[in-house]
Amino acid sequence: GSIERIEIIACGTSKHAAMVGSFLLEQFSGIPTNVFYASEFRYSPPPLLPNTLTIGVTQSGETADTIAAIDMEIKRRSSIEDKKFKPNLIAITNRKESSIGRQVLNIIDICAGIEVGVAATKTFFAQLLSFYGLAIKFAQIKGNQSPDEIGKLINELIKLPPLLEDLLEKHNKSSEKLAHDFFNIKDVI
């Protein structure tokens, strides 16, 4: 059957991407979408509704709460014979060979590479782009956007790489200047 509802399960930075993703999915496709913190989902799951797509979002593919919540959702839905309640899952991750990759058949591999810093900048942005693409695809399938509007949305995505390159280049120059200016300073308040 057709997807009538979307549940997104995530933790941390992935949950923030999921919150933006839920907005995009609802705005573009018109499908009601809810975001759940994975640990809360496990202990207070929403009522089972038919034709629900569950999306698990985890940068590493190993986030324990997200994996446990997805596993619980698979078991809950598999215990019902009505096909409208069957598990319908997608995972968005940076590691398709991870635990979530083995757990979920449909994987969106964000291909962001290794995240060096603590702040998940590359993976966060890649998750946002994944949600944007998913929202466009659902809008196309549902017919909620005209072909012209879909084309405009895709063209806006195509414009992003050179804009980001310019932004990073400007940021690198200002960062280098700040580092040079503060290099010999011992204390900062």
Model-flagged regions — what are they?
Residues 1-4, 8-13, 155-189:
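Cofactor-pocket helix-loop regions in the catalytic cores of large enzyme subunits
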Residues 4-159:
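Glycine-rich phosphate-binding loops that contact phosphosugars or nucleotide phosphates
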